[in-house]
């Protein structure tokens, strides 16, 4: 009998002081009540790059194909996937509708590869509200960002 595909939740967030500036990202993975936190940062980055990185790094931790719900407060990341922007950008050689080049192409390409492995749904959550996991991700991302401010 084939084992049922695992259902994983991933909460993500990115933080940046200045844009560009020092930044951090975080993800919390939840599977059957077990939680795993990851975080990291860069000395000179953008908020969007940190938001995308959080999703990519979270998905990279999965060791087998999973059903995944990604919760993000980044409308940019959620809409890029759920509204088909990402596929359109790729089809148009990474040129947006406004004729400008998409930023962070390498990360978007990595995300596309991961989306082909996992069945991923993105859900937009309100940032800095009452969502416990989003708030924890925010604190982790800010903490990593702050390491570059000292």
For each of these PLM feature ranges, what is it?
Residues 1-4:
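A short acidic-Thr-Gly-centered motif at the start of a beta-strand
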Residues 49, 53-57:
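Short amphipathic alpha-helical face segments that pack within enzyme cores
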Residues 32-50:
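A short, polar/acidic, helix/strand-boundary loop motif
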Residues 8-10, 70:
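Residue-level marker for buried hydrophobic side chains located in beta-strands
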Residues 15-22, 56-136, 140, 145-147:
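RNase H catalytic domain
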Residues 24-31:
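Short beta-strand scaffold segments in enzyme catalytic cores
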Residues 21-24, 39:
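Short, glycine/acidic-enriched capping/hinge loops at junctions between secondary-structure elements
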């Amino acid at each position: 009998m084939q084992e049922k595909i695992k259902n994983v939740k991933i909460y993500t967030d990115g933080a940046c002081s200045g844009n560009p500036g020092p930044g951090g990202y975080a993800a919390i993975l939840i599977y059957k009540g077990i939680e795993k936190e990851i975080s990291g940062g860069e000395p000179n980055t953008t908020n969007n790059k940190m938001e995308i990185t959080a999703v990519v790094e979270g998905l990279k931790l999965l060791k087998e194909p999973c059903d995944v719900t990604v919760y993000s407060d980044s409308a940019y990341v959620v809409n890029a996937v759920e509204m088909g922007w990402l596929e359109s950008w790729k089809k148009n050689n990474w040129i947006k509708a406004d004729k400008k080049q998409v930023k962070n192409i390498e990360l978007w390409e990595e995300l596309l590869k991961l989306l082909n492995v996992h069945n991923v749904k993105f859900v937009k959550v309100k940032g800095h509200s009452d969502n416990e996991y989003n708030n924890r991700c925010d604190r982790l991302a800010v903490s990593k960002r702050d390491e570059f401010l000292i």
